[in-house]
């Protein structure tokens, strides 16, 4: 039998700049809702934009370069606090490429060894990254659930951190199983980083 899973939520408050923009968007979206102007597709798009704000970026289409909101990065600070609290190797999952970029920069500044495994890394380098995590000294495996949530065995990790989530239950379950599968002998802790009073609490 596999060891148990432990689930933890780490809450933080948005910066003032984030909160102001978040509330402005939420007010506008509620007005659209009462006006009957929303479809399922447009509702999901609005939720995505709110999630971008909660992540520290102004709403944008995913293919465009996002703009940071203000100077404070409370979600990053929450992540670093979690890494300080939980030792050993860890997997960090994020939804947006801009978030992965920001996490990578924060890890580098903090002197925390990591590998990146997502669409910004070519296939050969991904293989090297995986080996550096599973067999080498890299402490952090940084990726997106949409890129690495299936097929990989990463049982060296005892902590799995969801910097942000999407609405795919399959991707969530599969990404959890990267560390919790045959060969794992230790308890695995799953930490969700959640912005207070935002869509994070509904995902």
Predicted regions and their residues:
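SF2 helicase/translocase ATPase core recognition
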Residues: 1-26, 143-203
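Conserved Helicase C-terminal RecA-like lobe
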Residues: 2-152
């Amino acid at each position: 039998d596999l060891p148990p899973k432990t689930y933890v939520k780490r809450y933080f408050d948005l910066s003032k700049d984030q909160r102001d923009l978040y509330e402005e968007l939420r007010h506008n979206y509620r007005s659209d809702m009462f006006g009957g102007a929303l479809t399922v597709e447009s509702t999901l798009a609005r939720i995505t934009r709110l999630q971008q704000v909660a992540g520290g970026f102004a709403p944008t289409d995913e293919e465009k370069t996002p703009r940071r909101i203000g100077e404070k990065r409370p979600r990053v600070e929450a992540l670093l606090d979690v890494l300080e609290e939980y030792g050993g190797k860890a997997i960090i999952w994020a939804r947006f490429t801009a978030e992965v970029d920001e996490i990578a920069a924060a890890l580098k500044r903090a002197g925390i060894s990591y590998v990146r495994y997502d669409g910004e890394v070519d296939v050969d380098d991904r293989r090297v990254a995986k080996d550096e995590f599973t067999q080498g000294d890299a402490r952090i495996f940084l990726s997106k659930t949409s890129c690495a949530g299936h097929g990989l065995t990463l049982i060296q990790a005892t902590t799995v951190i969801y910097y942000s989530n999407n609405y795919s239950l399959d991707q969530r379950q599969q990404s959890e199983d990267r560390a919790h599968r045959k060969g794992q002998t230790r308890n695995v802790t799953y930490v969700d980083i959640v912005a207070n009073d935002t869509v994070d609490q509904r995902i």
